[in-house]
Regions:
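PP2C/PPM-type serine/threonine phosphatase catalytic domain
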Residues: 1-246
Length: 246
C-alpha cells in the first residue's frame, strides 16, 4: 500500500485549517484521518489538529483488527471527540470552533470509513471516480430535496454551510461506509478545497496517469491552486497493489 498525504494553504488563505495524518495501532492496522476546521482566529486550526491527533492517539493504543471492532470504536470515540471540542468551543477565544472529519480504517482488503461534514472520500477503480460520501451541507440537502439544480449548487452563496461537524452541541450522526478494495484501486480523501475547485473527471484523469502516488497528490493540489485555490487544499491518496488485497 502506497500513501501520500499533502496539504497546502491555497491561494487566498493566510493560515491552514486543514489537518491530516496516518496512524497504525498495535495490530499494525492503519487509520487515516482528515479534518477541515472552522471558527474565527485560530479556532479552526486547533479543532482540526486536535480531532486528528486525539483520535490518532486513541487508535494507536488499540489492538483492533476486525471490522466490527472498528465500528464500535467509531461509535464511541467520534462522539467523545465531538463533546470535547464542543466544550472547548464554549470559550470566548474558541467560539464557533468545529471541524469536518473523514476517518478511514484499512483492515486487510476492507476499507471502513466514517464521514462528518463536507470533506470527501472517493474511489478510483477501472478508470472511474466514484464519490463514496454525501456532503453534510445545506446545499446538498437542498439538492437532494430537488429545490436547486447541480449548477445552482456549485455557485450557491451558502455552499460553505455544513449541517454536521465535530464540535456541535447535538449528538453526531456520522455516515459510515465500507468498500472491499481490489488491486489497482485508489482511495482519495480530500477537503472541499480540492473538490470545490476541480471535478471528479479531473481527479480521475490525474489519478489514472503514470505519475507516482506522491506526484499525483502534488498534481491534484496544483490543479486546485491553478483553478483559484480559494481554500486550503488537503489530499490523501492511497494506492492498493496486488499484495495488499491478496
Amino acid at each position: 500500500m502506497e500513501i501520500s498525504i499533502l496539504t497546502d494553504v491555497g491561494q487566498r488563505r493566510t493560515n491552514n485549517q486543514d489537518y491530516a495524518n496516518q496512524y497504525k495501532n498495535k495490530a499494525g492496522k492503519s487509520m487515516i484521518f482528515l479534518a477541515d476546521g472552522m471558527g474565527g482566529h485560530r479556532a479552526g486550526n486547533i479543532a482540526s489538529e486536535m480531532a486528528v491527533t486525539d483520535l490518532g492517539a486513541a487508535w494507536v493504543a488499540t489492538e483492533i483488527s476486525t471490522i466490527n471492532e472498528v465500528r464500535e470504536w467509531f461509535a464511541e470515540y467520534l462522539e467523545k471527540e465531538n463533546q470535547q471540542i464542543h466544550r472547548i468551543g464554549q470559550d470566548e477565544e474558541h467560539k464557533g470552533m468545529g471541524t469536518t472529519l473523514e476517518a478511514v480504517a484499512i483492515i486487510d482488503d476492507q476499507v471502513l470509513f466514517a464521514h462528518v461534514g463536507d470533506s470527501r472520500i472517493g474511489l478510483v477503480r477501472n478508470g472511474e471516480y466514484h464519490q463514496l460520501t454525501s456532503d453534510h451541507s445545506l446545499v446538498n440537502a437542498l439538492l437532494k430535496a430537488g429545490q436547486i439544480t447541480e449548477e445552482e449548487a456549485a455557485h450557491h452563496p451558502q455552499r460553505n454551510i455544513i449541517t454536521q461537524s465535530i464540535g456541535q452541541k447535538d449528538e453526531l450522526q456520522p455516515d459510515f461506509g465500507m468498500v472491499t478494495v481490489e488491486a489497482g484501486d485508489f482511495i482519495v480523501i480530500n477537503s472541499d478545497g480540492l473538490t470545490n475547485m476541480i471535478s471528479g473527471d479531473e481527479i480521475r484523469d490525474i489519478v489514472v496517469s503514470d505519475l507516482s502516488v506522491e506526484e499525483k497528490a502534488k498534481t491534484l493540489v496544483r490543479f486546485a491552486n491553478n483553478a483559484g485555490g480559494l481554500d486550503n487544499i488537503t489530499v490523501v491518496l492511497i494506492h492498493f497493489a496486488e499484495e495488499d488485497v491478496a
